[in-house]
Amino acid sequence: MNNEEDLLQEDSTRDEGNETEANSMNTLRRTRKKVTKPYVCSTEVGETDMSNSNDCMRDSSQILTPPQLSSRMKHIRQAMAKNRLQFVRFEATDLHGVSRSKTIPAHFFQEKVSHGVCMPRGYLEVIPNPKDNEMNNIRATCFNSDIVLMPELSTFRVLPWADRTARVICDTFTVTGEPLLTSPRYIAKRQLSHLQASGFSLLSAFIYDFCIFGVPEILNSKIISFPALTFLNNHDQPFMQELVDGLYHTGANVESFSSSTRPGQMEISFLPEFGISSADNAFTLRTGVKEVARKYNYIASFFIETGFCDSGILSHSLWDVDRKKNMFCSTSGTEQLTITGKKWLAGLLKHSAALSCLMAPSVSCRKRYSKDRKDLKKSVPTTWGYNDNSCIFNIKCHGEKGTRIENKLGSATANPYLVLAATVAAGLDGLHSSNEVLAGPDESTDFYQVEPSEIPLKLEDALVALEEDQCLRQALGETFIRYFVAMKKYELENEEIAAERNKFLEYFI
């Protein structure tokens, strides 16, 4: 009997005790039908209706009607025939924002669109001890079962850097058809739904730094990797050009790329997009840059000798629900945020300690918060300013479309979906909280009444801040918070810094 049958048999024994084998098979058939219903083929987050009243909610994503599904599949089949595709990757993000996928032969694609692709849950959710589940103790028997990857057809793209292969980003569900409550993408989509229900939409883009190294060479018995690119940005243009062109064909529009602070370090900026697309673009980059680098015998890494790059900056602005007006841009002609923008920023400042736990979730990447400080403290102030790139929250006032806030809490280890979700949750709390009500749109920069929380330098303290932040606990879900905190505590208890560095190098390179 397979794992799914074992799970169903165990549940049926608990509920009824004397269920016959025939009834068990009927239950199995009903469960399979439940998983394969077409509601998971979602396209627009704005048309979802997700309640956050409890963690057992179901995803009510947009249902594709048979004509819509037929039209989508027709275009996909044409693309598969035109490019003579042989394989399709079903990709989902794990906790770190790294792609975990299953690849299927292309001729099975239509079947898998309806039924999904099963994957062991442990591939996405690494648990310290499967028998002592801290993350989802209500349904511990379900934790070690498979999950189902259901494709979002709007993300189907041919991968230019993989031979005759396409990919589709998936949402994750349990075998009983419920959304996986620890899925970062699901959490981000849920927060965007809440934002739209409040009458707003989010325009955002990620800015990433990464390093490109050549093949390691042995000099004087030491293995050394030299930078593959220079400050002049012309040492190996074909690599960056192929990467940017490939990202464009996967739906991720790059606004610019340039050399960064040291040889071999590059910065890449995406064009702002509404909704979940900005996180999808960042997710695509994190996989694509490594695959293109391998073709050139390079190594792409988000780790440099001084620690993780200041990577994963989220530049964002708030717009009305019709996406026509920037709610951050002041009409007074001065470089000031609107009252709405100030309330949003007040929410980010208020929750900055807890946000830092999600956006710098390792010991190594938190060192950059204190890299310029000689005094040893437990925390550092949360800084913000107008057109000041040294601040954690940098308010850029570049005209109506260019007025935005850069959230620089993110590091290379941050999951872009969690960065997006947590930013929206904190900003929404600022909009809705009476504590941050402004006295008036004056020119004073001291616009919030509640002092911003300081950023802990130790991950242990950041975990405490996250556990005590009731707003983020409710927004992201108790199940996810328990899972995230348990995982990080396990890492802190069982790994030294040197071992952690090696783990991250192996994982992220």
From Swiss-Prot:
Abundantly expressed in lens. It comes from the Eukaryota. GO terms for cellular component: cytoplasm; membrane; plasma membrane. Pfam families: Gln-synt_C. GO terms for molecular function: catalytic activity. Belongs to the glutamine synthetase family. May act as a component of the cytoskeleton or as a chaperone for the reorganization of intermediate filament proteins during terminal differentiation in the lens. Does not seem to have enzymatic activity. This is Lengsin. The lineage of its organism: Eukaryota, Metazoa, Chordata, Craniata, Vertebrata. The gene is LGSN.
